[in-house]
């Protein structure tokens, strides 16, 4: 069984629509979507949810990626994008659950025609990335 977290965003919605895998459980923090569980990892506990379904892998699309939403609600964006993402990833590693984590492109400054190197430090547009 695979858990797909964050299916209310663009990439998660696309993934859900076109995934050929049959054993997926989809979750969204914000809204109840068709074929989805509404599950907010910032409010609910991981362990009971994971025990119930015995997940073998997790695909994580969940984030607040809109720069204005992050700027206007710094506490929630830090909670979702950093604090609970770290807790979830630590939980997955501790329990040997394979995961794929998609991250925001907004970590980089966004200058056109510039090649970014992950090892270097940049000043990000996003408040929680600096």
Where are these regions (language model features)?
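NAD(P)H-binding glycine-rich loop region in Rossmannoid oxidoreductase-like domains
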Residues: 41-80
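N-terminal Rossmann NAD(P)H-binding glycine-rich loop of SDR-like oxidoreductase domains
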Residues: 1-21
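Short, polar loop motifs at secondary-structure junctions
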Residues: 7-10, 25-33
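NAD(P)-cofactor binding segment of oxidoreductase domains
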Residues: 72-100
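Catalytic phosphate/metal-binding cores of nucleic-acid and nucleotide-processing enzymes, i.e., regions
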Residues: 14, 18, 29-32, 76-78, ...
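Catalytic helix-loop patch of NAD(P)-dependent Rossmann-fold dehydrogenases
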Residues: 79, 83-84, 107-130
